[in-house]
């Protein structure tokens, strides 16, 4: 993975849409069933919308019925970081981009048991899909 991407909040605001900024830089969550990538079967790679790092592959995407794109694993363990998140009175594991620290979503232990058993529940707005990769 490349070296860390560091920008000022102003630079992020200039680069991202207001919704992308709210979710990725302020740890927000998009409304369920509203994201562009919630339903997509096209093969390709999902990159971080902030820094372009490759994060997830459509081959490992599945329909969890939760309203957000769900994957059973990242493209590479080195592409993400996981952090304990105790916000909103809950105890969850937050998933961030290792390269730029953008908030992507959360990982839960209720994914497909025939693969990893994990569900990476990711905000569509935090991703940029590159078909055919």
Curated annotation (Swiss-Prot):
Zn(2+) binds at residues 48, 51, 97, 100. The keyword Zinc applies. GO terms for cellular component: cytoplasm. The active site is at 121 (nucleophile). Its cofactor is Zn(2+). Binds 1 zinc ion per subunit. The zinc ion is important for the structural integrity of the protein. SUPFAM superfamilies: Mss4-like (SSF51316). Transmembrane segments: none annotated. GO terms for molecular function: peptide-methionine (R)-S-oxide reductase activity; zinc ion binding. The keyword Disulfide bond does not apply. Residues 1-12 have a biased composition (Basic and acidic residues). Belongs to the MsrB Met sulfoxide reductase family. This is Peptide methionine sulfoxide reductase MsrB. It comes from Chromohalobacter salexigens (strain ATCC BAA-138 / DSM 3043 / CIP 106854 / NCIMB 13768 / 1H11). The lineage of its organism: Bacteria, Pseudomonadati, Pseudomonadota, Gammaproteobacteria, Oceanospirillales. The gene is msrB.
